[in-house]
Curated annotation (Swiss-Prot):
It is found in: Nucleus. InterPro entries: Slu7_dom, Splicing_factor_SLU7. It comes from the Eukaryota. GO terms for cellular component: spliceosomal complex. Residues 1-42, 195-231, 481-548, 555-574 are annotated as: Disordered. This is Pre-mRNA-splicing factor SLU7.
Amino acid sequence: MLSTSTSLQGGKVSREEYRRQKDLEAARKAGTAPAALDEQGNAINPHIPEYITKAPWYADTGRPSLAHQRINEQGPHLKLDEWYDRGAKAGPAAKKYRKGACENCGAMTHKMKDCVERPRKRGAKFTNKDIAPDELVQQFEGDYDAKRDRWNGYDPASYKHVVEEYEATEQMRKKYREEEIDQQTSTDMAVVKKLAKKDKEGKVEDDDDDFGSSDEDEDDEDKYADAADQVGQKLDTKTRITVRNLRIREDTAKYLINLDESSAYYDPKTRSMRDAPVRNMNPEDMKFAGDNFQRYSGDATNMQKLQLFAWQSAQKGSNINVSANPTAGELLHREFQQKKEVLKDTNKTSILAKYGGEEHLQRMPNELLSGQTENYVEYSRSGQIIKGRERAKARSKYDEDVYINNHTAIWGSYYDLSTSQWGFACCHSVLPGSYCTGDAGKLANAASSASALLASSNERSKIEEAAEKERESLAEQHLKDLASGKAKKGKEREWDLPQYAKRREDGEELDLDKGRLKNALKEEKKRKKMGEDEAWQQTKKGKTDVTQEELEAYRLSRQAYDDPMSNYQDPEDQ
């Protein structure tokens, strides 16, 4: 409904104001109060809902209006003959180069990078010669459709040359056809004899113009016949094919075979005639014997069986409807057929088991009855069927389930991956004619395998290396002792130098200087009290090598979270 200016502006309305608005709306609907006016002074229908008359917040003007529901007026459209005048010049060319003009051609309407002329060796800016005139710049502000119209600005007069070319081709085609027919007529002996005979007998033209024409008229018409070969086309007009769905007029329609009203009925809607149009006639001698044969072709018979099954089931109380649920009916019918076949086989088996006579039902193969067959069968050298109607199943050439030479498994029950050979699973033997050796044979084959031989060769090489070390000469041992003695003396002389850190072996004790260790502990505590940035700056300024004492100080001062005494502090250190 329409609202007042207070409600349009979004202010809170009191009860009295809200009641006054409702009364005004009711009066406007009843016609006792004048209707509201919009910005243009037009009356607004009071029956229009409020959600239509109320403008959104971004288009609200504070007054009731329907301007937001109307389409904005569009500007004038471009005319058909109003378009860019391509290649038009604004005036004569200048004589001197002007400041701000194109450096290449000298025009004022574009810059050098947008110039479409060939780049000159020396531009017009430096030569003041051959200055191009200014182009005529036109501005057209078209609407959305005008900017996207592919035919906007197209000149229909430009298609005139296509029409002229087609007319010239058509004239040449007619002229070529006339010359071809004239040449063919002059050389045709049959036409010459016919004309001579006609002149000799002195016959006049027939007066059957309404039903035909003379040969001369036909010859003249052939000159302009549409069936003539056209120049520039590969289509042979003499061998045109008619449309496939057009019936050839040589055959007779089924409803025209017998015009007797009491004959077979023809249904024009389905174009079908079920019965034969001519009675008392052999169907084999008839060209058309009716469309009833189609009722027994395809799935028509199966559909009749399905419908019969549905009717019989409905009589017995089953709710089967082929039209309402054809899928369920098809599934039930298929299940019924399967059960029927099973029951038929069961009855046959029980009767044969009770009364006998199964041997009389067995039939000899066709090969034995006729003595020969046309079925192609191809056999292998071992007598197996390779190709034919009855292909035998693939079977092994070895005797199955035959245990030889005390084996408990057949040949081929084991496959050795290392040697890619088949064998017996009971003893892992890969020889077909070997005797079974049981678990001892498995161990022997495992020991003689390639992996076991490689492992034994590795152990042998290790033993040889150990023996080689034991065979070192006394001279080499003496040289090593001398070298170790010099190293010890060097260590005594270098006792005052710092010992750099190395990995401690298991059970090895390091000789640490107590004074250096104490100083390292103080430095480590001082480093931990520093901030992160300050410690990083101090680390960059210091040395990069770590001594054994510094490493030991780090280990001693490192906090162990799983140590119950990690938080204990000596009173002397506090």
